Amino acid sequence: MSKIIAINAGSSSLKFQLFEMPSETVLTKGLVERIGIADSVFTISVNGEKNTEVTDIPDHAVAVKMLLNKLTEFGIIKDLNEIDGIGHRVVHGGEKFSDSVLLTDETIKEIEDISELAPLHNPANIVGIKAFKEVLPNVPAVAVFDTAFHQTMPEQSYLYSLPYEYYEKFGIRKYGFHGTSHKYVTERAAELLGRPLKDLRLISCHLGNGASIAAVEGGKSIDTSMGFTPLAGVAMGTRSGNIDPALIPYIMEKTGQTADEVLNTLNKKSGLLGISGFSSDLRDIVEATKEGNERAETALEVFASRIHKYIGSYAARMSGVDAIIFTAGIGENSVEVRERVLRGLEFMGVYWDPALNNVRGEEAFISYPHSPVKVMIIPTDEEVMIARDVVRLAK
């Protein structure tokens, strides 16, 4: 038996989950928030109860030391020698990393070298990696990349129709994200369907505040909706998804905003928030539609119809589909979004049961038994995928 800790470091946060492997039992999980800001918050769950402490945590290294102290203080582990491996979520692996990788000084430098591809995320991920390396230098650590799963996409999927030298010189191409989640739910779908993954054509819909759709054929990603950055694809909580690129100079001219300001609007003030005018939270939007709010209704329809279009396009791309999977916060919990996305897909063999769809947050088939295309809800588990990769690579 081994104990593996899965880490997701943000710019001012650190999420953690400790697993007993290979049973995949979760021993504890928690979150450090507001790192480097006054009144940092440390939350850890012990025997199902949440313990919260407000204190000053100036940087990630202090957060890591506090986390490790709490593991022993609460008796979750006897001492730090019990930790056999650390898995770090890293958002962007570029073209360099098509699989998770054991972290060495060399691989850390390579991750730093591609940080410009994900300036909001990778630097924070690296801070987390270095903080653990400082405190537990001899424990094997693994980086698990959001982009790695999509490195199987063929050229016709990942190339933009731009001058080819942009790709050669600057690495401008589609990378795709949420790969760890898409990989988990498609592997789990094969288990639930009782069929080999290599024989399946699957469409995975990871719908959270960020959302992406993936076409997975024979267990390999062949296309996905996000692009060079996580801004592309479907409309999201605050992100615009795909727009006409010529809009950017047009908006700059009309509003007097700089390019960075327009980009900030596309990333943080668009999507559900932009259209509804009041919230990026889908639950608020759904409630408002029940009260007759027309802008909320429009926001919900835009969100669902973009997903609906990707499903149709990916089914065409794979010459059919065996199952459609809904996952992540919205995909797992929003009865209304699933209903709107699936409406009208009967022409391609999708027959779903409204009664079965009335489920939240648990594994379920929501299609009729006779439906040629199965529709499934599979709660994602990116952390367990990280732990599995640590076990696989740190042997």
Curated annotation (Swiss-Prot):
Active site: 146
Keyword Kinase: yes
Site (Transition state stabilizer): 178, 239
Protein localization: Cytoplasm
Cofactor note: Mg(2+). Can also accept Mn(2+).
Binding site for ATP: 15, 206-210, 281-283, 329-333
Pathway, per record: Metabolic intermediate biosynthesis; acetyl-CoA biosynthesis; acetyl-CoA from acetate: step 1/2
Domain of life, per lineage: Bacteria
Activity regulation info: Induced by glucose excess, the induction may be mediated by CcpA transcriptional regulator.
Binding, Mg(2+): 8, 382
Gene Ontology BP, a term: acetyl-CoA biosynthetic process
Keywords: ATP-binding, Cytoplasm, Kinase, Magnesium, Metal-binding, Nucleotide-binding, Transferase
A cellular component annotation (GO) from this entry: cytoplasm
InterPro entries from the UniProt entry: Ac/propionate_kinase, Aliphatic_acid_kin_short-chain, Aliphatic_acid_kinase_CS, ATPase_NBD
EC number(s) on file: 2.7.2.1
Binding-site list for substrate: 89
Cofactor(s) it depends on: Mg(2+); Mn(2+)
Gene Ontology molecular functions: acetate kinase activity; ATP binding; magnesium ion binding
Similarity-based family: Belongs to the acetokinase family.
Function comment: Catalyzes the formation of acetyl phosphate from acetate and ATP. Can also catalyze the reverse reaction. Appears to favor the formation of acetate. Involved in the secretion of excess carbohydrate.
Subunit details: Homodimer.
Name of the protein: Acetate kinase
Species name: Bacillus subtilis (strain 168)
Organism placement in taxonomy: Bacteria, Bacillati, Bacillota, Bacilli, Bacillales
Gene responsible for this protein: ackA
